[in-house]
């Protein structure tokens, strides 16, 4: 036990007689064993806490320090509790009294343990290792048995704390990263079914994209071509002035209400549309008609359209008007009775009719621009909706009345019943003509606006609201202004030829009066029969719309003069 005395002396503790440590060696061993048991209990408690807090791995490294902390700090407060040990300590080493004034629970070996810890100032966890080394050093002393048993007991406590870390499974990064060699590693930018060479696997995503874009597959080439085609379509439709795609095709819909709402919220695409809108506003100011705000007019137009769609004019009224027109066909009275029929649909529409009429006129199957509109045309003018009992006939008649410019070409007389509606109708017809010519390429546009005979027959049936077998087809054109009939500019042969082209049998009355005006064709149809030039080339004076009724020849010249307005 000389090593213990040497260790104590190095710490400043003077040992007295040499026989003291030999007598108290067994007591020291017992005390140390009790201390080891206490440490084991603390370790068990810490293990239970660590098991409960296993979810927080940062706590796994904390358990070792607390068990080591009590021995150095606990030896001094535990001292005053055992006065009998103090006498043994005083007898064993007389110098312990002045160095440690209080009485200690452990005799001289415990201070020697503290002395060994005082030399290397390390973490408290190192407490166990110097203890084992201390007893190993003491094993060379005169009592190997007493010194040899504690090392096993003292070395046992340090083993449990690492077991907490052993419970955590270590991740083998090499085995986990082995999946990088598989094809699934490249699932982000390539199909997993394709196999690659090692050089292809080593490519970065950017290099891979560059390689694929430089060497496209047939599928990618086809996709690229289709995308370019779509982009070109969108670009050309956006660039062309008032082309069917930009102003019409994008606004096609299956319901009439949608068409009207789109036309009311029409967007000005280019300069031509701006000019058309400016003309409309100028005419409305000239007639003192559009004095109200744009919001009120749009609201009234939507209300009038909705009321018109619900069938404000019954079938009996249509039949009555058609009978009147049959009588009026021989002697042409003033057209006052007809004008109120158009007024429910035109009273509150300052400008939306123009674009809807353009849209409807270009939907004909004979259009040179978009034959794909046949579906829309068949949907609107189907020959199945010809019985007088069905509501679609009424909406077809309303749509036809808005789409065909002849119906909006009634003279602006100063009759009482036409004070409201006639300015709108004449203005709409004029702006329709100007919009057609302002778009450019007049002849092709005129021909594209002429409906085919079959479609014209459908239109005639839908306006008349009766089957062909019941009445003569001539009544189908009851809503066309009779002033156009007596047009001196239209030879009778032209009217007969055009009317025979429509597939409708010509009655005997056709020989006495011009039928061209009754055939429900738009005015551009004059270019079919020999004169391919539009009538806008003839310079004629523009007439004011606020004049008393004129003879038929002056009205026809006024009608042709409207064509000149859109050519500026």
Curated annotation (Swiss-Prot):
Q: What is its main location?
A: cytoplasm
UniProtKB keywords: Coiled coil, Cytoplasm, Cytoskeleton, Methylation, Phosphoprotein
Task of the protein: Microtubule plus-end tracking protein that might be involved in the regulation of cytoplasmic microtubule dynamics, microtubule organization and microtubule elongation.
Q: In which tissues is it expressed?
A: Expressed in embryonic stem cells. Expressed in brain.
The record's subcellular locations are: Cytoplasm, Cytoskeleton
Q: Does the keyword Ion transport apply?
A: no
Quaternary structure and interacting proteins, as annotated:
Interacts with MAPRE1, MAPRE2, MAPRE3 and CKAP5. Interacts with ZDHHC17 (via ANK repeats).
Q: Give the lineage.
A: Eukaryota, Metazoa, Chordata, Craniata, Vertebrata
- Region Disordered, annotated ranges: 1-22, 59-92, 139-162, 235-256, 291-403
Q: Which residues form a coiled coil?
A: 21-56
Where Asymmetric dimethylarginine occurs, the residues are: 471, 543
Q: Where are residues bearing Phosphoserine located in the sequence?
A: 243
Please report the organism this UniProt entry assigns to the protein.
Homo sapiens
Q: Which gene encodes it?
A: SLAIN1
Polar residues: bias regions: 235-245, 385-395
Q: Can you name this protein?
A: SLAIN motif-containing protein 1
By sequence similarity, the record places it as follows: Belongs to the SLAIN motif-containing family.
């Amino acid at each position: 036990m000389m090593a213990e005395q040497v260790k104590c002396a190095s710490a400043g503790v003077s040992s007295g007689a040499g026989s003291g440590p030999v007598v108290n060696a067994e007591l020291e061993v017992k005390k140390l064993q009790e201390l080891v048991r206490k440490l084991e209990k603390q370790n068990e408690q810490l293990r239970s806490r660590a098991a409960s807090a296993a979810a927080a791995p940062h706590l796994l490294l904390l358990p070792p320090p607390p068990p080591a902390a009590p021995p150095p700090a606990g030896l001094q407060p535990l001292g005053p509790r055992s006065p009998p040990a103090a006498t043994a300590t005083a007898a064993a080493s007389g110098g312990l009294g002045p160095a440690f004034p209080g009485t200690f629970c452990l005799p001289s070996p415990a201070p020697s343990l503290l002395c060994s810890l005082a030399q290397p100032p390390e973490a408290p966890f190192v407490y166990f290792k110097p203890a084992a080394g201390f007893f190993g050093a003491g094993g060379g002393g005169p009592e190997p048995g007493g010194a040899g048993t504690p090392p096993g007991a003292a070395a046992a406590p340090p083993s449990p704390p690492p077991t907490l870390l052993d419970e955590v499974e270590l991740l083998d990064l090499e085995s986990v990263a082995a999946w990088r060699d598989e094809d699934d590693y490249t699932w982000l930018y390539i199909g997993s079914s394709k196999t690659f060479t090692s050089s292809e696997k080593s490519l970065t995503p950017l290099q891979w994209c560059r390689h694929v874009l430089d060497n496209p597959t047939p599928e990618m080439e086809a996709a690229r071509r289709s995308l370019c085609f779509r982009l070109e379509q969108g670009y050309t439709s956006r660039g062309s002035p008032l082309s069917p795609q930009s102003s019409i095709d994008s606004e096609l819909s299956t319901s009439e209400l949608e068409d009207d709402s789109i036309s009311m919220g029409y967007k000005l695409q280019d300069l031509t549309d701006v000019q058309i809108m400016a003309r409309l506003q100028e005419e409305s100011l000239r007639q003192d008609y559009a004095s109200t705000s744009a919001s009120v007019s749009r609201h009234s137009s939507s209300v009038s359209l909705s009321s018109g769609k619900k069938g404000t004019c019954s079938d009996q009224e249509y039949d009555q008007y058609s009978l009147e027109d049959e009588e009026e066909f021989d002697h042409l009275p003033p057209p006052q009775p007809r004008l109120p029929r158009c007024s429910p649909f035109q009273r509150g529409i300052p400008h939306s009719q123009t674009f809807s009429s353009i849209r409807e006129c270009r939907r004909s199957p004979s259009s040179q621009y978009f034959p794909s509109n046949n579906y829309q045309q068949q949907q609107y003018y189907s020959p199945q909706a010809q019985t007088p009992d069905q509501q679609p006939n009424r909406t077809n008649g309303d749509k036809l009345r808005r789409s065909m410019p002849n119906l909006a070409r009634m003279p602006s007389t100063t009759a009482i019943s036409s004070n409201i509606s006639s300015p709108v109708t004449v203005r709409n017809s004029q702006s329709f003509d100007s919009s057609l010519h302002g778009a450019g390429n007049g002849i092709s546009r005129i021909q594209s606006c002429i409906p085919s005979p079959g479609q014209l027959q459908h239109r005639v049936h839908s306006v008349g609201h009766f089957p062909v077998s019941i009445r003569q087809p001539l009544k189908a054109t009851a809503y066309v202004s009779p002033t156009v009939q007596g047009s001196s500019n239209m030879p009778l042969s032209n009217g007969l030829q055009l009317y025979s082209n429509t597939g409708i049998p010509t009655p005997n009355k056709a020989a006495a009066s011009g039928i061209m005006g009754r055939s429900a064709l738009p005015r551009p149809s004059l270019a079919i029969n020999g004169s391919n030039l539009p009538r806008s080339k003839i310079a004629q004076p523009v007439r004011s719309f606020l004049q008393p009724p004129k003879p038929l020849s002056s009205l026809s010249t006024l009608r042709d003069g409207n064509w000149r307005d859109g050519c500026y």
